[in-house]
Curated annotation (Swiss-Prot):
Superkingdom field: Bacteria
Catalytic activity: Hydrolysis of DNA containing ring-opened 7-methylguanine residues, releasing 2,6-diamino-4-hydroxy-5-(N-methyl)formamidopyrimidine; 2'-deoxyribonucleotide-(2'-deoxyribose 5'-phosphate)-2'-deoxyribonucleotide-DNA = a 3'-end 2'-deoxyribonucleotide-(2,3-dehydro-2,3-deoxyribose 5'-phosphate)-DNA + a 5'-end 5'-phospho-2'-deoxyribonucleoside-DNA + H(+)
Record's protein name: Formamidopyrimidine-DNA glycosylase
GO molecular function: 8-oxo-7,8-dihydroguanine DNA N-glycosylase activity; class I DNA-(apurinic or apyrimidinic site) endonuclease activity; damaged DNA binding; zinc ion binding
Species of origin: Serratia marcescens
Length: 271
């Protein structure tokens, strides 16, 4: 599943081709995604793009009369291609935005768990309501994590993945951040000390920022907007490495199920 770095990589990749230009029209080949593609998107015509933003794992395309909200789901990706390639769409290419600069923004999603929604005012969007702070913002810090963790019996790993606590820390980056901070994922969140909370917040920021710089993590379906894979997978310390030696101490990496999601950790390096 594309996580925050992959979505931010997509945002940065498509922004130069959209902002300052207009969407001439949309081509929707399959409207049956996680939710049906909004009717307002189907009827877009000559709409200037004012900005391309991100909130959590949602891409927000600002137009003069509203917003397109895009979620990549489990396997979605966005890429830019030239308009002459419009007829080369495959069976998993569900949505195109045709831009007035000769480019097309194409949405590909083999599993069709993504979403293309319309909203006139982001403040009224149900999918954006009740989200926690952005992990790369100043609002997310050690003091915040420590206060939120008090008396929490939830295991640290699934706790970090709760979008009401902090957005965008998905399965990959929760495992990687906990390893970098030396914290076992199966401890209760309430066991965090102030020092550990400060280190964990700092580590989450560093891991996410590094992944963004590397273009995200390509595990199955994710590609950058230029069609190239992300390279952070080459730097993964624990995720997906069960049974392999820890890159730090050589102890075999272990895996466990937390909240029905696979968690990876080093029993020696993490406490």
């Amino acid at each position: 599943m594309p996580e925050l770095p992959e979505v931010e990589t997509s945002r940065r990749g498509i922004e130069p081709y959209l902002v300052g230009h207009s969407i001439q029209y949309a081509v929707v080949r399959n409207a049956r995604l996680r939710w049906p593609v909004s009717e307002q998107i189907l009827t877009l015509s000559d709409q200037p793009v004012l900005s391309v933003q991100r909130r959590a794992k949602y891409l927000l395309i600002e137009l003069e009369r509203g917003w397109i909200i895009v979620h990549l789901g489990m396997s979605g990706s966005l890429r830019m291609l030239r308009e002459e390639n419009e007829d080369e769409a495959g069976k998993h290419d569900h949505v195109d935005l045709v831009i007035n600069n000769g480019m097309i923004l194409r949405y590909t999603d083999p599993r069709r768990f993504g979403a293309w929604l319309w909203c006139e005012d982001l403040a009224t969007s149900s999918v954006l309501a009740h989200l926690g702070p952005e992990p790369l913002s100043e609002a997310f810090n050690g003091d915040y994590l420590y206060e939120k963790s008090r008396n929490k019996r939830t295991l640290i790993k699934p706790w970090l993945m709760d979008n009401k606590l902090v957005v965008g820390v998905g399965n990959i980056y929760a495992s990687e951040s906990l390893f970098s901070a030396g914290i076992l994922p199966d401890r209760p969140a309430g066991s965090l000390t102030k020092a550990e909370a400060a280190l964990l917040a700092k580590t989450i920021k560093a891991v996410l920022q590094r992944s963004i710089e590397q273009g995200g993590t390509t595990l199955r379906d994710f590609l950058q907007s230029d069609g190239k894979p992300g390279y952070f997978a080459q730097e993964l310390q624990v995720y997906g490495r069960a049974g392999e030696p820890c890159r730090t101490c050589g102890t075999p990496i272990e895996s466990a199920k937390h909240g029905q999601r696979s968690t990876f950790f080093c029993r020696r390096c993490q406490r």
